């Protein structure tokens, strides 16, 4: 019996789940949404999460929509798929990724997942052996942190250096690693920093990972979202140096995150992952996981094959324009420093100068009051591992973006120590 004679039940909250959820972007966004003033009739400016698909300017290509409809009408994809995906989808992804490489990827190395997030879940679960640790960047995409916490895989953080264009602190990586380190994560183009790694820097990362005897996880969900001086280069180019697992999806480039179609590709030309047994472990975890909708998989050849380059180039030009406006407007706000002009993905990281602000205690307080006073959502940096910074999403309608920076400027002026 429980207190006061009440019946005691043998289930309840799971502390591991609670801790893991507290690391997610969604948890922070929900907190900020609850801060919004319901009496404010202005539209909410959503610069906190990376999903521009609701905006008319970022609708997907009609060819992709028709591919889905054709796959459904065909009735060929009403059945379950194999655990690693429908063969035509695996082949389509292999050919799509190979078009950027100096070699061909085998469809057998492609595993189709329910978005990139499921690929993360599968991979972290496979890596989480007792005593192991993984190297994650700081700042980071926190789904890796959350899943690692859930799987009780130790995380060690290496720094991305804003003064060096957010390049990896490779000396720090070597200092963190030991004989229990299993992998290093590289997100390129980078969420949350908005940088694109050069070919030379990627090679140095691969060489460092080889020296340490660890595999490279290459999160390339923003592949081809590069609009600065550096072209996108896949870490797959360095698979001869070190085992690489590439994660990706159609979510970002096609602006369809709700379709939940991603992939995980094992690049292991020397058989290192296979001989160690890790590939089989990965397949075993895949076998315990659910599959993406089969008709989405069946549509993949036509989604990839029928989407014209004009669609990609026009959308990328739009994102680039948004990035330029974002950077220009940030430079006008004294209490905010943007160390690097964004050149990839749809985000940038900026630092708050609290010496110029009053009544603001930290980045979460800043974002909470911004939501309440200006109906504007920006993600606090602590959500991505960098306290007292902000992650700003700029891929929205231009009118919303301009209005958002007007509100942000008004907010910072109102909370400035030097206000009249």
Curated annotation (Swiss-Prot):
Pathway membership: Amino-acid degradation; L-phenylalanine degradation; acetoacetate and fumarate from L-phenylalanine: step 2/6
Question: What's one GO-annotated cellular component?
Answer: cytosol
Recorded hits in InterPro entries, A to Z, give: Aminotransferase_I/II_large, PyrdxlP-dep_Trfase, PyrdxlP-dep_Trfase_major, PyrdxlP-dep_Trfase_small, TyrNic_aminoTrfase
Q: Does the keyword 4Fe-4S apply?
A: no
Principal EC category: transferase
Keywords of the record: Aminotransferase, Pyridoxal phosphate, Transferase
Keyword Transferase recorded: yes
For this protein, the Enzyme Commission number is 2.6.1.5
User: Single Gene Ontology BP term?
Assistant: tyrosine catabolic process
Q: Name one Pfam family in it.
A: Aminotran_1_2
The cofactors required by this protein are: pyridoxal 5'-phosphate
Please name the NCBIfam families in this protein's record.
Answer: tyr_nico_aTase
Q: What does this protein do?
A: Transaminase involved in tyrosine breakdown. Converts tyrosine to 3-(4-hydroxyphenyl)pyruvate. Can catalyze the reverse reaction, using L-glutamate in vitro. Can convert phenylalanine to phenylpyruvate and catalyze the reverse reaction in vitro.
Q: Which family does it belong to?
A: Belongs to the class-I pyridoxal-phosphate-dependent aminotransferase family.
| Protein name, entry field | Tyrosine aminotransferase
Question: What is the species listed in this Swiss-Prot or TrEMBL entry?
Answer: Arabidopsis thaliana (Mouse-ear cress)
**Which gene does this sequence derive from?**
TAT
């Amino acid at each position: 019996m429980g207190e006061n004679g009440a019946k005691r039940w043998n289930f309840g909250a799971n502390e591991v789940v609670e801790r893991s959820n507290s690391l997610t972007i969604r948890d922070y966004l929900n907190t900020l949404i609850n801060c919004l003033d319901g009496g404010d009739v202005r539209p909410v400016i959503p610069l906190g999460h990376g999903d521009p698909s609701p905006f008319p300017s970022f609708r997907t290509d009609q060819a992709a929509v028709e591919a889905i409809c054709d796959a459904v009408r065909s009735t060929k994809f009403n059945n379950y798929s194999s655990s690693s995906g429908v063969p035509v989808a695996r082949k389509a992804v292999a050919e799509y990724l190979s078009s950027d490489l100096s070699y061909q990827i085998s469809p057998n190395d492609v595993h189709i997942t329910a978005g990139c997030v499921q690929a993360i879940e599968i991979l972290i679960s496979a890596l989480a052996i007792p005593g192991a640790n993984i190297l994650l960047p700081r700042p980071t995409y926190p789904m890796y942190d959350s899943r690692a916490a859930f799987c009780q895989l130790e995380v060690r953080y290496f720094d991305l250096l804003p003064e060096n264009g957010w390049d990896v602190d490779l000396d720090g990586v070597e200092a963190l690693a030991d004989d229990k380190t299993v992998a290093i994560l590289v997100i390129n183009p980078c969420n949350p920093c908005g940088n694109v790694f050069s070919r030379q820097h990627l090679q140095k990362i691969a060489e460092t990972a080889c020296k340490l005897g660890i595999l490279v996880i290459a999160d390339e969900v923003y592949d081809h979202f590069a609009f600065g001086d550096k072209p996108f280069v896949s870490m797959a180019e360095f698979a001869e140096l070190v085992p690489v697992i590439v994660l990706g999806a159609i979510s970002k480039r096609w602006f369809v995150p709700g379709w939940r179609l991603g992939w995980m590709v094992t690049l292991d030309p020397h058989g290192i992952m296979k001989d160690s047994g890790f590939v089989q472990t990965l397949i075993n975890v895949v076998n315990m996981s659910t599959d993406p909708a089969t008709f989405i998989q069946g549509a993949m050849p036509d989604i990839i094959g029928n989407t014209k380059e004009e669609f990609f180039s026009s959308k990328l030009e739009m994102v680039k324009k948004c990035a330029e406006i974002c950077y220009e407007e940030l430079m006008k706000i004294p209490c905010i420093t943007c160390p690097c002009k964004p050149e990839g993905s749809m985000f940038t990281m900026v630092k708050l100068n609290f010496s110029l602000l009053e009544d603001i205690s930290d980045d979460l307080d800043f974002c909470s009051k911004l939501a309440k006073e200006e109906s504007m959502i920006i993600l606090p940096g602590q959500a991505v591992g960098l306290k007292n910074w902000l992650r700003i999403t700029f891929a929205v309608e231009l009118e919303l973006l301009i209005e958002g920076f007007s509100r942000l400027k008004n907010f910072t002026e109102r909370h400035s120590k030097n206000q009249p």
